[in-house]
Curated annotation (Swiss-Prot):
Transcriptional repressor for the ans operon coding for L-asparaginase and L-aspartase. NH4(+) may influence this repression. GO terms for molecular function: DNA binding. Residues 17-36 bind DNA. This is HTH-type transcriptional regulator AnsR. It holds the Pfam family HTH_3. CDD domains: HTH_XRE. Disulfide bonds: none annotated. It comes from the Bacteria. Transmembrane segments: none annotated.
Length: 116
């Protein structure tokens, strides 16, 4: 995790450790542990941090934004050619939502791999 980035984002907003922890609904010591590297946030906490600081989990983890690679494009083309629809709450997923779903799963797997 990019610890400097987490501290930088908090200080940019002029928030104290306590105020930030309160916004997240966690103990000050827990949040301070994230910034110092003593603790690692769960996936849920990482998502909350990204939302709080209006950034992405990838950015908090210090990852570069990646372009869609050829295998991803091929996978999506293959996916689009299949003759079925995936829906959530009775509404079919759009192509953008499918891309977001694939990206989410890949990111989750990478984060879990890094944390283990």
């Amino acid at each position: 995790m990019n610890l400097d980035r987490l501290t930088e984002l908090r200080k940019k907003k002029n928030w104290s450790l306590q105020y930030t922890a309160d916004l997240l609904g966690i103990a000050k010591s827990t949040y301070a542990g994230y910034e110092s590297g003593y603790r690692r946030p769960s996936l849920e906490a990482l998502a909350m941090l990204a939302d709080l600081f209006d950034t992405t989990c990838d950015e908090l983890l210090g990852r570069e934004k990646q372009k869609q690679t050829a295998p991803q494009a091929i996978e999506l083309a293959t996916w689009s050619s299949l003759d079925f629809t995936i829906s959530v709450d009775g509404q079919p997923l759009s192509e953008d939502e499918i891309i977001q779903l694939i990206t989410f799963i890949r990111t989750k797997r990478k984060v879990q791999e890094e944390l283990s």
